[in-house]
Structures are given as structure tokens and as C-alpha cells.
Amino acid sequence: MANNLESNISQIVLKKFLPGFMSDIVLCKTVDRQLLSGEINSNTGDSVSFKRPHQFKSERTETGDITGKDKNGLFSAKATGKVGKYITVAVEWTQIEEALKLNQLDQILSPIHERMVTDLETELAHFMMNNGALSLGSPNTAIKKWADVAQTASFIKDIGIKTGENYAIMDPWSAQRLADAQSGLHAADQLVRTAWENAQISGNFGGIRALMSNGLASRKQGDFDGAITVKTAPNVDYLSVKDSYQFTVALTGATPSKTGFLKAGDQLKFTSTHWLNQQSKQTLYNGSTAMSFTATVLEETNSTASGDVTVKLSGVPIYDEKNSQYNAVDAKVKAGDAVSIIGTAKQQMKPNLFYNKFFCGLGTIPLPKLHSLDSAVATYEGFSIRVHKYADGDANKQMMRFDLLPAYVCFNPHMGGQFFGNP
């Protein structure tokens, strides 16, 4: 039956738009999209909170008598999701109308959903880069051997992450450099493949799914220098950080009066404090070397005239003697501890990402229909998208707009991070 161009146009266009949009996404498929579903809407404001899981400690005794022992407390903790900015593509109605008449709607819609997916996945990549606390490899060293990929699976397993899929996301050039190991490449014989299928380098390599993406975020390192140490020991007991998994620390020894001394995405290494396996609470080792705790800068910060820097970090060296089941590290960060900044000052880079599916979450706000007879909203596999036909009276034009409003949450910064190759 021919398309009726007089009514329900937005609904017709939306039905065509959604499958193409889903076919284009890659990065969005690797993070949790269910926990945000139904929790955040147009009435929740700019944030929404999610409950973090409880952890418990065990008592080891000779007789089983736990008289006088501290019992596990139930502490309610939350992760807070933030609503982003609208992603909107507006086009003149005449383009859509002509495509409908000629049965060429797919060709017109393709660049629209490609643009929306690109914006969405680049913003998601920035969010993930700035929130993941883990760090592997040598900055700006290319991924060129499968051992560079396998290190991510080793770290995720060793730190005690057991549930959900694990991913290593690399730029497209990494696939070329890994192409000599043909047995590791993902293969499929279908003629038409989605962006997800085309992105796969390896379906499962040592417990990690290797994917390529052109949506990874690039950044420039801060203008840092100096022998950095902790000036004041931060408060990192569980009750102080449970709702954010972020902390602020005062450092000293920086080059004085530097604007942009640290930038968002920079990673700090606390060399005297080491990661624990989150289940067994044993110190992590790579060979004979204990793995130092790392955290990621959330906001750009300057150094003072006296060489001090106060920085907000994602990832927390939790050390709580009373609630040790939540400990992330083997020792408390102390004043005087050495801190190194990973990488080179003012270095341009595009980090690869590795993480567990439950590191971050993505959702979209169900948007209300605009005041019009021709406005459609649909939720499809966790994505809510609005299509609206309207008139621009001032410009004397008929228009159609496509809208999506994303929301992002970091459930646990200790479940993801940046990685590079090794020299």
C-alpha cells in the first residue's frame, strides 16, 4: 500500500529510522542499558541514583565463636547518573517527502542516524575515558601484538571482576597491526553486516572481546612537571566515598603557577599503594611487581604559586579498617607518598578502553511529544527517540527533527580504564 503523506508521517519515518540507528551502534552495545531503563525520565531532573551492591567480610576462628566480633553493617550506597545534552538533527521536510514518494527513505535517513550515533558514542567514550580508574601499557605505544590485548583480560580477571562481558576497544589501525595473527580475527560470511559485526576483531580472546571503534575520544595531557607527593592524606574510608567512588587529594611538589597542570583524563599512579583483588583481598602482582593504584582526573586543575595541586579523581584507594570488605588497596594513602603522572606532559593521545559491561551505563530520556498532530516517540532496545514534523513560520519552511537525550552513569570506576601497547 502506498505511503499516506497526509498523516502519521513521523510514525512512518520513525519505524524506518530505528533499525538503521541500532545497526550503526557499537560502543553503546558494550555497556549496560538496562539498569537506567525506567529509572530516568523527563521528570527526574539532571541526575538519578542507583543502589550499589553490598559486600560482606567473613570471620576466621578456631571454634566458630564470633562473640565480640564486629558484625557486617548494611550501608546504602548509590551511583549517580547524569543527563547529557540533546542530540538533534533537523532537516527540511521536502527531503523526507521526496524520499517517501520515491521509496528512498533509507538513503535519506542513513546519514541522520549515522550523525546521531557518532555524537552519542563519542560522548560516551569521553565519559568512559574520564571515569575509568584502571591503567595498562605505555601511553601512545600502539597496540601491535595480541599480548597487548590479553593484558586487559588478565587485569580484569585478577582484580576479581566475575560477572558480565569484558571488552577491549581499540582504534581501527589496531586491527591492521593485529592482522598478522589471522587466527585471532573475527570472521563472518554474511554479505550484509551490522556495524557491531564489522567492529569485532576477536569474538573472545583470553576472556576479552576485542572491538574496533572510530568513536574513541582523544585528549591532550596536562602541562605537568615536578616531583609530586601527597601533601595531605585523603579521607578514603568507605562511608566517605560510597556514593561517588571519587575523592579529592592535595598534592605538592608541582611546578608552580601552571595553568592546566592536570587535565581531565590524565591518570595518576600512587606508587606506595597497590590494588587488591576485590574478592580475595590479596595484592595484585604482575610477575614480581605489585600493581600500583591508579585514578583518573575528572576536572582540569592548576598548580599554585607554592607548587600545590588539589585534584578530583575517579577511582578511590578505599582502605577502611572497620569495613575491610570494601577495601580496594593494600595500604592507606599517606602524606609524603610519591605520585607519578602517567604519560608525557602536553602529549596528544587517543587511549584505548578496556572494561566490564557493568563499568558504565547508558540510557535515554523518554521525550514527550511536542504540541503537534504529527509527533512520534518510540523506545527500542533501551533507546528512546523522537521524530517531529513542524513548520518554521519565520523561515517559511516545513521541517522534521530527530531527537535523543542521553544519560550516563559510572557504576564502578574500578571496572574499566585506559590501555596502550607495551614497548
Swiss-Prot record:
GO terms for cellular component: viral capsid. It comes from the Viruses. Keywords: Capsid protein, Late protein, Virion. Residues 56-67 have a biased composition (Basic and acidic residues). Residues 47-67 are annotated as: Disordered. InterPro entries: Phage_coat_Gp5 (IPR024659). Disulfide bonds: none annotated. Pfam families: P22_CoatProtein. It is found in: Virion. Assembles to form an icosahedral capsid. Belongs to the P22 phage major capsid protein family. This is Major capsid protein. It comes from Acyrthosiphon pisum secondary endosymbiont phage 1.
